C-alpha cells in the first residue's frame, strides 16, 4: 500500500477572533480540555497517518514546536514549515512539496473538528484509493456560506461552487481532503483567484473535470465544527464537554489514539501521564492502561 502523508494547515491571522488571537494562534486556543490543533492531528492519526507536516505562520511555528515537539512521544514524525503569508489553502502543497515527495497526501484544516463513530472507516476508503481525490461532504442548512458540492448516486462530484448565491445542494465541502501525488503539480500550476489566493476549490475542480473526485458523505451521527468565531469556539467546547462528561471517554486524545493504534505502548503512556497527573487528563491516561 502506498504511503500517505498528512498536512495540517494552521496558519492565518485569526482576525475574526481578535483580540483573542492577537498574540496567539487560533489553533492553540483551548477546545474544552485540549488545544485546538489536537483535533485535526487526531483526525489524521485515526486515518493511520503518522508522517505529518504542520504549516503555520513565522511567529506561531515555534509555539507549535514547543507544544507538539517531533511527535515521537505519540509514535509520529512531525515536521514544520512556515507559510509567510496566507495565500490560499492550495499553497500547502507547494510549501509541502519536499515533505510529500512521491507519496499521496491528506490535508486537514487546523480549525476543523470532526467527530463520528465511523470516521476511521470513512477515511480508510479514502486512504486506500489508488488515485484521484476524496472530499468529505456534510449537510448544512446554510450552504451559501461554504464551498458546495453536487454529486451523483455513485458519489462522483458533478459540480463545485464557492459560496454560491443559489446552492445546487445542501452539502458543504469540509476541511478534510485526500489527494494522490498529482496534487503538487496541480497546485504549482494554479492561477491565483480574484482574491489573490490559490484556491482548494480550483484543485478539487480539476480532479472533478478529470472524473477523479470522489465525495464521501458524512451523514447523520457525524459532527463537523469549524471554529472560526467566538460563538463557534464556545459551541465546540460545549459539544466536546457534553460527550466526554457523559461517556467518560475522551474525544481526539492523541495519547489514547496512539496507544490504541499500537504506535506507543503502556510504558510510554505512563511517562506521558506523569506531568499531567494532577488533573483529569493525566488520570484518564493512567486509568486507560490499568491492568497492563
From Swiss-Prot:
Molecular-function annotations in GO: glucose-1-phosphate thymidylyltransferase activity; metal ion binding
The protein's required cofactors: Mg(2+)
Enzyme class: transferase
Recorded catalytic activity of this chain's protein: dTTP + alpha-D-glucose 1-phosphate + H(+) = dTDP-alpha-D-glucose + diphosphate
InterPro entries listed in its UniProt record: G1P_thy_trans_s, NTP_transferase_dom, Nucleotide-diphossugar_trans
Entry annotated with the keyword DNA damage: no
Domain of life: Bacteria
GO BP annotations, alphabetical order: dTDP-rhamnose biosynthetic process; O antigen biosynthetic process
Entry keyword annotation includes Nucleotidyltransferase: yes
Pathway: Carbohydrate biosynthesis; dTDP-L-rhamnose biosynthesis; Bacterial outer membrane biogenesis; LPS O-antigen biosynthesis
Pfam families registered for this protein in UniProt: NTP_transferase
The record's free-text note on cofactor binding: Binds 1 Mg(2+) ion per subunit.
NCBIfam families: PRK15480.1, rmlA
Family membership noted in the UniProt record: Belongs to the glucose-1-phosphate thymidylyltransferase family.
Protein known as: Glucose-1-phosphate thymidylyltransferase
Species annotation: Salmonella anatum
Lineage: Bacteria, Pseudomonadati, Pseudomonadota, Gammaproteobacteria, Enterobacterales
Gene, per the UniProt record: rmlA
Amino acid at each position: 500500500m502506498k504511503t500517505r502523508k498528512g498536512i495540517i494547515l494552521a496558519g492565518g491571522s485569526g482576525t475574526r477572533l481578535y483580540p483573542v488571537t492577537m498574540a496567539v494562534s487560533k489553533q492553540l486556543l483551548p477546545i474544552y480540555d485540549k488545544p485546538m490543533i489536537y483535533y485535526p492531528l487526531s483526525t489524521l492519526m485515526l486515518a493511520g497517518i503518522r508522517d505529518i507536516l504542520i504549516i503555520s505562520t513565522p511567529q506561531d511555528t515555534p509555539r507549535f514546536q514547543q507544544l507538539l515537539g517531533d511527535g515521537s512521544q505519540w509514535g509520529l514524525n512531525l515536521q514544520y514549515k512556515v507559510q509567510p503569508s496566507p495565500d490560499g489553502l492550495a499553497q500547502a502543497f507547494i510549501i509541502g512539496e519536499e515533505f510529500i515527495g512521491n507519496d499521496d497526501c491528506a490535508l486537514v484544516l487546523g480549525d476543523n473538528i470532526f467527530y463520528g463513530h465511523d470516521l476511521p472507516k470513512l477515511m480508510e476508503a479514502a486512504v486506500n484509493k489508488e488515485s484521484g481525490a476524496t472530499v468529505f461532504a456534510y449537510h448544512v442548512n446554510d450552504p451559501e456560506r461554504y464551498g458546495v458540492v453536487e454529486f451523483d448516486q455513485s458519489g462522483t462530484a458533478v459540480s463545485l461552487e464557492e459560496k454560491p448565491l443559489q446552492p445546487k445542494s445542501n452539502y458543504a465541502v469540509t476541511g478534510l481532503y485526500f489527494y494522490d501525488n498529482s496534487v503538487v503539480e496541480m497546485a504549482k500550476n494554479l492561477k491565483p483567484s480574484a482574491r489573490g489566493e490559490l484556491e482548494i476549490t480550483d484543485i478539487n475542480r480539476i480532479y472533478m473535470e478529470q472524473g477523479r473526485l470522489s465525495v464521501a458523505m458524512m451523514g447523520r451521527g457525524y459532527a463537523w465544527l469549524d471554529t472560526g468565531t467566538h460563538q463557534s469556539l464556545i459551541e465546540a467546547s460545549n459539544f466536546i464537554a457534553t460527550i466526554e462528561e457523559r461517556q467518560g471517554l475522551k474525544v481526539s486524545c492523541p495519547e489514547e489514539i496512539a496507544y490504541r493504534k499500537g504506535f506507543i505502548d503502556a510504558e510510554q503512556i505512563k511517562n506521558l501521564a506523569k506531568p499531567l497527573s494532577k488533573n483529569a487528563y493525566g488520570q484518564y491516561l493512567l486509568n486507560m492502561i490499568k491492568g497492563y
